[in-house]
Amino acid sequence: MNKLLQFILLVLIGTAVSCSSNTNKNTIDYTGIGELPTKDYVDHLAAAAGDYLAFEETKTIKLRPDTIDFLETIYDRLVSNNQLILNLNERPTFYIIQHKSPFLFSLPRSQFFFSTALIERYLKSEELFVAAFAAEVVRSQRFIYEKRIMLPLGFYSTEKMITLTKLKFDTKEQVNEWTYFVLKRAGYDASAFLNWIQIQNRNTLDFAMYLGDSVGISKEEHLFKNFMTKQGVLGVEKRFNEANSSKNFYKLLNNVASRK
């Protein structure tokens, strides 16, 4: 994970340079940053989406055009403001899965999966939704996944997909810091990502399937608070008001609630 640490240092340097001079940010070379699996593994992991969606227990809800537009707008804003590391030409696909447990995960090629329970019970403000989503955008585009054995079963359950996309703690910690910078550069309130971590930590029983080991999330919150303090962020304990969300976000919530 030394390469991810290198990336974070480069972002800090790049941010300082962009603020102190008119230097073109494209002169900073981010090529090769991130720990990437082999292309064959990336292709196999990306293709697992088909096996997951084909599994009889995987039930998706139909996304309305305005929901898709809203999700694509967030994606475009995140990516377009971070083109040193993210590719705007890669178009996303979104799936909302009917499931009683809260979870989200991504696969390579900008494929994103959210559970209905996560959106309805926990991501009730737009800033929180964007914060959780941003980490998966980073992972998907930079291929930040652990290499695991993938048996050709022809189907994958939700539990298996979460296992396939789970990260080691040290990697996850660095992705969290990476996500902070991506949110900040896109003009979002990056402190919302701390709230997303805290939500998981306060509801470990509900997030048991997603987290696996619930002990790590407390450490994750502690380390991210320290990281934010080092960034000069004051008042890290902040709540995000649902009322501040856009009309388009409420359309997403309505789409999920209607299950149509």
Model segments located where?
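C-terminal capping/extension segments of zinc metalloprotease domains
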Residues: C19-A49, A54, L63, N81-N89, ...
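Sec-dependent bacterial lipoprotein signal peptides
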Residues: M1-V17
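Active-site His/Glu-centered metal-binding helix of metallohydrolases
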Residues: A132-R142, Q174, W178
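Zn2+-dependent metallopeptidase catalytic core
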Residues: I68-L86
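Catalytic zinc-binding patch centered on the HExxH motif and its immediate surroundings
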Residues: F94-S110
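Short alpha-helical catalytic segment bearing the HExxH-like zincin motif
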Residues: F113-F114, L128-E136
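Catalytic Zn2+-binding segment of zinc metalloproteases
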Residues: Y122-E127, E136-L153, G187
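Active-site metal-coordination segments of metallo-dependent hydrolases
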Residues: T60-D69, E159-E177
